[in-house]
Swiss-Prot record:
Substrates-to-products reaction catalysed: (6R)-NADHX = (6S)-NADHX; (6R)-NADPHX = (6S)-NADPHX
Chain residues that bind K(+): 74, 144, 180
Described purpose of this protein according to its UniProt entry: Catalyzes the epimerization of the S- and R-forms of NAD(P)HX, a damaged form of NAD(P)H that is a result of enzymatic or heat-dependent hydration. This is a prerequisite for the S-specific NAD(P)H-hydrate dehydratase to allow the repair of both epimers of NAD(P)HX.
Organism: Legionella pneumophila subsp. pneumophila (strain Philadelphia 1 / ATCC 33152 / DSM 7513)
Family, similarity comment: Belongs to the NnrE/AIBP family.
Positions that bind (6S)-NADPHX: 73-77, 148-154, 177
Keyword Transcription appears in the UniProt entry: no
Name of this protein: NAD(P)H-hydrate epimerase
This protein's UniProt keywords: Isomerase, Metal-binding, NAD, NADP, Nucleotide-binding, Potassium
GO molecular function ontology, one term from the record: nucleotide binding
């Protein structure tokens, strides 16, 4: 049986375990910001640092990493990861997809993402604008920070081409929140998707990681609660008994967990 942890208490990942749709996850995020006064920037920084912590724990010998960042909040998490990776002695390279470095905030980019992008630039982290003909080098690990839960509709052709290119690498792929191309609520592929070696997700378990194609494409799952108060999970109820979660859905998953009561990552074993 697989487990994930909620405030130090092991719970089975099965039909009785609360998991969340994207709309419910967004409610949790709103509560964190509005009721518990945790800013969007703070949440972004907590998640990016947690992702880097897991990366180091899971692949301790990796040095050269390539982080593919979109222009949304998922990309912001990738920028935070890049900064943390440099502090920990790694050599991060950021590939900017659909945007580029700018001294003024680009249209449609959140202030927090722009802040973290500029922080990377100021710290001397390599920032490259991605193009289909550019040489991606020889990374030892790839980080997928393209869309996360923010994917709507099908993956655009130029992104699909990038995903196919990345899938040809024979190195580990760490997805932040949700593998690009996987619907975080349904687990279905949005035209094309990037299969991850592991996915780290935050605040709550997303249903799409546990069902349909998402179960396969997410690889191992790491979960970090971002220091969320226990009361928040009572305010927004997850899916406790879902017909979408049958008895065979989650039992083949490796799920790492960490919360504010724990210092390190722990792994559930079937």
């Amino acid at each position: 049986m697989d487990y994930y942890f909620t405030k130090g208490k092991p719970q089975l990942v099965n039909m009785k375990t609360p998991v969340y749709l994207v709309t419910q996850f967004q409610q949790l995020m709103d509560l964190m910001q509005n009721q518990y006064q945790v800013s969007c920037l703070e949440l972004m920084q907590r998640s990016g640092k947690a992702a880097c912590d897991f990366l180091v724990y899971r692949w301790p010998k990796v040095k050269k990493i390539s982080i593919f960042c979109g222009r949304g909040d998922n990309g912001g998490q990738g920028y935070v990861l890049a900064q943390q990776a440099k502090k920990m002695g790694m050599i991060p390279t950021v590939w900017q997809v659909g945007h580029q470095m700018s001294m003024s905030k680009p249209p449609q980019m959140h202030e927090e993402v722009w802040y973290e992008m500029n922080s990377c630039h100021q710290q001397g982290i390599l920032l490259h604008t991605y193009s289909p003909d550019i040489d991606l080098g020889d990374p030892e690990l790839i980080v997928d920070a393209l869309f996360g839960v923010g994917l709507y509709g099908h993956v655009r052709p130029e992104i699909a081409s990038l995903l196919q290119r990345l899938q040809q690498f024979t190195v580990p792929i760490l997805a932040i929140e949700v593998p690009t191309g996987i619907n975080a609520s349904t687990g279905e592929i949005a035209g094309n998707a990037l299969a991850a070696t592991a996915t780290i997700t935050f605040l709550c378990m997303k249903l799409g990681l546990l069902i349909n194609d998402g179960k396969i494409y997410s690889g191992e799952i790491a979960f970090d609660d971002l220091l969320a108060p226990e009361a928040i999970y009572q305010q927004v109820k997850g899916i406790e008994k879902s017909s979408l979660l049958d008895s065979s859905t989650c039992f083949s998953k490796k799920i790492w967990y960490r919360n504010k009561t724990q210092k390190g990552w722990q792994l559930s074993i079937n």
